[in-house]
């Protein structure tokens, strides 16, 4: 992927080819990525064979179809110029998630593990976007190969979004994408590495280390190797798919709950901070404004809910703290695991969890939501506005990590926040139009747009989303996609000006 996103080869205004979209280059990238997905299918087929299951044949059917389409795309890409424009970049990231979902649903559908096209697409989109919402009412009935593929979709999706947000977005710049630029707000901390491909390899290595470390700890806690790997895939990606219908509560193990809660939080932190730690600059982690904001929020919400569970639900202190920490970590990092039915908790705690869902994790992590960096900039700008009302002539810049945030970045944050709320409102109204209850509609929309997983009411952590109307599932699948790709990266393709030369 490094050669495709080499900034030295990006279109700067003068090119031998004046076409608006470099279709051949897009075909080449998508073709290569489909071959990579085929390799993942092959791995899942091997898992099925290891367990003596017949589902391997459905993965082989999918591989044949996948490689055929990938091959056609590569043939069509012959003679492609090795350059990409901003438009090409937006097309690639959107089409990649869509095509991966389209082909990724086929093993579920071919095996009849999920016999409905709508449900299979929803389940796979929920996986690749690391949302974790499921339509399955009997997860254990799936074969090991399908369960492995289900968790692997989340690990691939999380891996992809780390590369997308830290390596790809800063190249393109502009609008909300500037939010991730080192020049804009120092998110990548002195340009983590000058070469995008090298930086991506380091980030993927960190991603793999977190996954392996958690797998080992979960096995120590009593999980089988298969379950430990699948849950580590889901945790590191902040996805939330489990191999059990009861999710993590199935094991009823405090050790396992603490391990997963800690790794959810670790996965919600900006991955470039880990890179700085590896370079011997560990102080940067604790000096980072977003990291401190995120940890304060997790700590405060956990303590408040702990007291509520002790004094209103009569939990003992350790259990209350453990359940509160786990569910706050799940909501704040947009992971979909559950150890308790929070529908039975005091109602005010639902609002705290919704706040955590909206906030999400840190920029440059696998988590979803609005992101703490945006909320921090928004809050500091509001604080400055109050000061400006008292001191009209005062110069009050917004600072993050001691760097002044430009007015254009502040404007992009405000725009993103307003548009995020608009998407919630629009999705909420649409779901109620199709017969979903007011609380359920609100929570499933927030959960889907923030890539969280569980909602409230009939679609809370104790229930699947199978009862949703098909139309609602397609709407929520679209919200998952735009939420995963930061709204504008997808919606820009529906703007007429995107396809016009101006």
Predicted feature descriptions by range:
Residues 1-502:
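Membrane-proximal intracellular helices of multi-pass ion channels
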């Amino acid at each position: 992927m490094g050669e495709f996103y080499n900034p030295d080869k990006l279109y700067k205004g003068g090119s031998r080819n004046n076409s608006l979209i470099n279709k051949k280059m897009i075909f080449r990238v998508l073709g290569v990525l489909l071959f990579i997905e085929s390799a993942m299918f092959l791995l899942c087929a091997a898992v099925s064979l290891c367990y003596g299951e017949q589902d391997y044949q459905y993965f082989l059917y999918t591989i044949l179809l996948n490689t055929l389409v990938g091959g056609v795309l590569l043939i069509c890409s012959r003679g492609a110029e090795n350059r990409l424009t901003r438009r090409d970049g937006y097309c690639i990231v959107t089409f990649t998630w869509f095509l991966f979902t389209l082909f990724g649903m086929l093993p579920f559908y071919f095996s009849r593990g999920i016999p409905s096209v709508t449900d299979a697409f929803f389940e796979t989109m929920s996986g690749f976007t690391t949302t974790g919402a499921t339509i399955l009412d009997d997860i254990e009935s799936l074969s090991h190969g399908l369960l492995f593929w289900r968790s692997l979709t989340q690990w691939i999706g999380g891996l992809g979004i780390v590369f997308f947000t830290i390596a790809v977005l800063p190249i393109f710049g502009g609008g909300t994408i500037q939010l991730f630029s080192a020049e804009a707000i120092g998110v990548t901390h002195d340009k983590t590495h000058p070469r995008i491909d090298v930086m991506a390899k380091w980030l993927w290595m960190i991603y793999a280390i977190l996954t392996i470390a958690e797998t080992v700890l979960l096995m120590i806690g009593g999980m089988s190797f298969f379950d430990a790997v699948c849950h580590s895939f889901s945790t590191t990606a902040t996805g939330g798919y489990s191999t059990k219908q009861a999710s993590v509560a199935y094991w009823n193990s405090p050790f396992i709950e603490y391990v997963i809660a800690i790794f959810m939080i670790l996965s919600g932190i900006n991955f470039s901070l880990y890179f700085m730690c590896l370079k011997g600059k560990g102080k940067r982690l604790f000096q980072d404004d977003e990291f401190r904001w995120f940890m304060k929020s997790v700590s405060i919400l956990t303590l408040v809910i702990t007291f509520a569970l002790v004094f209103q639900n009569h939990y003992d202190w350790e259990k209350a703290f453990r359940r509160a920490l786990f569910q706050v970590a799940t909501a704040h990092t947009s992971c979909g695991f559950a150890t308790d039915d929070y529908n039975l908790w005091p109602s005010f705690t639902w609002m705290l969890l919704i706040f955590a869902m909206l906030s999400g994790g840190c920029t440059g992590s696998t988590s979803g939501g609005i992101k703490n960096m945006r909320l921090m900039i928004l809050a500091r700008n509001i604080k400055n506005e109050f000061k400006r009302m008292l001191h009209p002539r005062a110069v009050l810049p917004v600072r993050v990590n001691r760097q002044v945030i430009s007015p254009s970045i502040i404007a992009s944050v405000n725009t993103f926040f307003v548009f995020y709320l608009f998407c919630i409102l629009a999705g909420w109204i649409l779901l109620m139009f199709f017969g979903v209850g007011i609380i359920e509609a609100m929570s499933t929309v927030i959960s889907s747009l923030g890539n969280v997983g569980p909602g409230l009411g009939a679609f809370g952590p104790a229930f699947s989303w199978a009862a949703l109307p098909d139309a609602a599932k397609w709407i929520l699948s679209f919200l998952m996609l735009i939420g995963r790709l930061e709204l504008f990266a997808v919606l820009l393709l529906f703007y007429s000006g995107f396809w016009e030369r101006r």
